[in-house]
A protein has these predicted regions:
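Juxtamembrane/disordered regions of integral membrane proteins
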Residues: 1-229
Length: 229
């Protein structure tokens, strides 16, 4: 049942992204595959490896099922969204972008959300990590810089090609594909109670992070209007 819900949630969000995107066809399917796999699996595996929840030799076995799932779901989402053939482009196609300042904002937002959510949930999951040697705080913070930029990179092609309502769409991508969905099925690495609390943690924080990323992509500082003589 949880596998079915996992597949349904991922397909539903990919369909929403496909409907909001200005791209179409195979190009759109590949962008959905990239976003789905990286957000829904690869970026989480980075942290699982870092916290010794997963061993390096288990990475391929852990990543392969998600790669297959998104390779199948991505073209299906494009097809049922009616975007396999050329359609109307999104009205905000090509607008927006990131600057060094906005990327710093992305990193700062992710760090703030990560540590805030983690601090609130840690008392409920501390027993799971007692037997593991946790890395120093500065190393954890450094890894989150990388992960925040990986999150952005995964959806950047979609943003550059035009994505209507980008903040809310990214909030759904990060919170469902990268939050609640992958924690639904049983897995040999994390027991149900730990997945439950982590699910609350990442779903809420990732939703807010998606709003921030979408807003910062479109944000431009206002230029002063020259006074007329």
């Amino acid at each position: 049942m949880m596998i079915g819900l996992y597949l349904f949630l991922n397909l539903a969000v990919l369909w929403i992204v496909a409907r909001a995107s200005a791209a179409n066809g195979l190009r759109l399917a590949l962008m959905l595959l990239l976003a789905g796999f990286v957000v829904g699996s690869a970026n989480s595996l980075i942290e699982a490896l870092f916290f010794h929840v997963l061993r390096a030799r288990d990475l391929v076995a852990a990543a392969l099922p998600a790669a297959i799932v998104f390779a199948v779901l991505a073209p299906i989402a494009v097809l049922i969204a009616g975007r396999w053939r050329r359609g109307a482009a999104a009205s905000d196609a090509g607008r927006g972008g990131f600057t060094p300042l906005t990327l710093l904002g992305v990193i700062a937002a992710y760090e703030l959300l990560y540590w805030s959510a983690g601090t609130l949930v840690f008392p409920y999951i501390a027993h799971f990590y007692e037997a593991r040697s946790l890395p120093p705080v500065y190393e954890v913070a450094a890894v989150q810089i990388v992960r925040s930029l990986v999150f952005v990179g995964a959806v950047y092609p979609l943003l550059r090609n035009g994505l209507r309502s980008a903040p809310i769409v990214l909030a759904l991508v990060y919170s469902i594909i990268g939050g609640v969905a992958p924690l639904l099925p049983d897995n040999p690495y994390m027991p149900p109670d730990i997945r439950f609390y982590h699910g609350i943690e990442v779903t809420v924080s990732n939703f807010i992070f998606g709003l921030v990323v979408g807003w910062l992509f479109a944000w431009r500082p206002r230029r002063p209007v020259a006074a007329q003589a």
